Structure formats: structure tokens, C-alpha cells
């Protein structure tokens, strides 16, 4: 391959990355989400702050009366319309006595921003949030992009001594290795991220994972189509750090925290929804909402008691 073709291919990879990752993420208003009101007694405090880029960030504190003092979680959502897609997880932690701090990143959900500025923007938002609320005795827990965010926060903040990464990635280049064959192409995206965010784009999680004395719990399914197991959890295992425990699960794809029944239900209902949209059978907002009338969202978000039990024991120890 001559140089011009190689550069053209790298440019295409960067464009695909921008088009799929660096966009605005809002709710599909037809798709149901759990609400705080679905959980009697759950308290939600909503606030905002302006981040260093001038974007208004919405953040939330969830808890039940009688929560245990100094048992705080920072829940880092995955890429998508914000924390509301994770209310089942958040409520599970609150029910166990934790206070949960969470946020919608720049360009996501209720927060401002025309798009997500970079994959490291959530890290910046979360760090600035922690600096604001002063909950320094806190455990980051995150899924997917949120898993990467939780990992970076644990790396960056000495006060964090424990973190949970669910289906997360080590770096953006390791994430891209699930979609491209050559490391040189994946590294192109890493260099692009450094240009987008020179401060947070240079984070070296590999060195951190090799040497850290922090306690980390990493949970990943071997058949994850979104974040490749071998290039992420597999690399963590190879480092052999005794302070990091990797729980490998099978047949859970990108959501190992969900029960098998919830995954089957979600795949069937959402698959049917997307198919009917493609077939132009759900052409109006009313028709799309009606599709979910007999499909309670709680059946799509039921937590796996074994996996959540492992997480709760880890963060409670």
C-alpha cells in the first residue's frame, strides 16, 4: 500500500470514528426509561454546573433515607442519552445503602453541547464534577464508555482507591481494535483524541494497570460486540496485577450486569422495534410509543443477582 492510500484509509477511520462517537446523544422519546418515581422513597437531587468548556452539565444525587455515610458511588454512564438508561443499576446501589452521584456528559441527555467533544470529555466532566461536590471518598463505577471513564478517574485521582469497570476499554485505540485489523489504524484515533483534548487524551491506563495498588474489579463478557474482550479485559489479565480482579462471563454481550432473561427480552423487543421502523410500520411518534405499551422497561433492565452481588461485595469491603 503506498503512502497516499494509507493516509486515505487512516482518514476514513478517523471519519468513521467522528461520525459514530462524536455526535449528540439524546433519548428516543418513544423508548421507555425507568424514572426515580418508579422506586418509592428514592430521593433525586438534580443540579447543574458549567464545565471548563462552558457547557452546562446536569448531575444528580440519588439515595434512600438512611443511606450509610461515606458510602458514595460515582456512576459513569455509557455512551448514549445519559444516566437515565441506568436507573436499575443506580437504584440497586442506593438500595444497598450507597449515595450515588451521576451525570449526563457533554452532548448527552439533559446536558448541553452540540455533540460529545471527545471520548475523554466524560473524564473531564466527571473530574470537574468531583472537584465541585467534594465527595472525595467515592468509588467510580462505570459501564462501556463509563467503564473507561471510571478507570481514568481511578488513574488520575489519588483519593480514589477502588473502582468497578463493566465492559470498559483500556484506551480508545484498544477499543478501536475491535473494529479494525491493524494497530496503526487504531493508534491513529488515539492521536486524534490527543489533538481534541491534549490534557486528558494523553492518559496512560496501561502503565496504571500494570503498577497500581488500587483495587479494581473488571467485568466483561467474551462475546461483547461493542468492546472487544481480548483487546481490553484480556490485556488486563495479561498484566497479572494481583490488585485487579477480572470476572469473565459468557453469552452476555455488552451487558453482563443484566440477567439472561432481561437480555433476551431486550433483544426481542428492541430488535422488533428497529425492524418495524425499517419497514416503515412505525412512522409516527404515537405509533412508536404505542409499541411499548405492553412492554414494561423493568423486564429489559433486570439485574443479574450474581454479577451485582460481586460488585456490591467489592465496593462494600
Model regions: which residues?
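An N-terminal hydrophobic leader/cap segment in hydrolases
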Residues: 1-51, 55-62, 274-290
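The serine-hydrolase catalytic nucleophile loop
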Residues: 79-91, 230
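Catalytic nucleophile-loop/oxyanion-hole region of alpha/beta-hydrolase
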Residues: 80-83, 108-133
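Conserved alpha/beta-hydrolase
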Residues: 90-112
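Hydrolase active-site cap/lid region
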Residues: 152-201
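Short beta-strand/loop motif that positions the catalytic acidic residue
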Residues: 212, 218-220, 224
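Short alpha-helix in the alpha/beta-hydrolase fold that links the catalytic acid
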Residues: 228-238
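C-terminal catalytic histidine-bearing segment of alpha/beta-hydrolase fold enzymes
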Residues: 243-317
Amino acid at each position: 500500500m503506498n503512502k497516499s492510500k494509507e493516509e486515505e484509509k487512516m482518514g476514513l477511520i478517523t471519519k468513521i470514528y467522528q461520525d459514530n462517537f462524536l455526535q449528540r446523544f439524546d433519548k428516543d422519546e418513544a423508548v421507555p426509561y425507568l424514572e426515580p418515581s418508579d422506586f418509592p422513597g428514592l430521593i433525586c437531587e438534580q443540579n447543574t454546573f458549567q464545565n471548563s468548556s462552558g457547557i452546562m452539565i446536569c448531575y444528580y444525587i440519588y439515595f434512600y433515607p438512611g443511606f450509610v455515610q461515606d458510602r458514595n458511588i460515582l456512576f459513569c454512564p455509557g455512551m448514549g442519552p445519559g444516566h437515565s438508561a441506568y436507573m436499575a443499576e443506580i437504584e440497586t446501589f442506593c438500595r444497598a445503602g450507597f449515595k450515588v452521584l451521576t451525570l449526563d456528559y457533554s452532548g448527552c441527555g439533559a446536558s448541553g453541547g452540540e455533540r460529545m467533544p471527545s471520548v475523554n470529555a466524560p473524564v473531564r466532566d466527571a473530574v470537574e464534577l468531583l472537584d465541585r461536590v467534594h465527595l472525595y471518598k467515592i468509588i467510580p463505577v462505570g459501564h462501556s464508555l463509563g467503564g473507561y471513564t471510571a478507570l481514568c478517574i481511578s488513574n488520575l485521582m489519588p483519593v480514589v482507591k477502588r473502582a468497578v469497570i463493566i465492559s470498559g476499554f483500556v484506551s480508545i485505540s484498544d477499543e478501536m481494535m475491535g473494529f479494525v485489523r491493524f494497530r496503526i489504524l487504531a493508534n491513529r484515533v488515539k492521536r486524534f483524541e490527543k489533538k481534541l483534548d491534549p490534557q486528558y487524551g494523553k492518559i496512560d491506563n496501561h502503565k496504571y494497570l500494570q503498577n497500581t495498588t488500587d483495587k479494581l474489579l473488571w467485568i466483561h463478557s467474551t462475546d461483547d460486540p461493542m468492546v472487544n474482550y481480548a483487546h481490553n479485559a484480556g490485556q488486563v489479565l495479561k498484566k497479572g496485577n494481583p490488585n485487579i480482579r477480572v470476572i469473565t462471563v459468557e453469552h452476555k454481550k455488552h451487558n453482563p450486569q443484566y440477567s439472561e432473561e432481561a437480555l433476551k427480552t431486550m433483544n426481542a423487543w428492541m430488535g422488533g422495534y428497529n425492524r418495524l421502523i425499517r419497514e416503515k410500520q412505525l412512522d409516527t411518534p404515537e405509533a412508536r410509543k404505542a409499541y411499548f405499551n405492553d412492554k414494561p422497561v423493568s423486564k429489559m433492565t433486570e439485574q443479574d443477582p450474581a454479577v451485582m452481588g460481586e460488585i456490591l461485595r467489592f465496593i462494600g469491603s
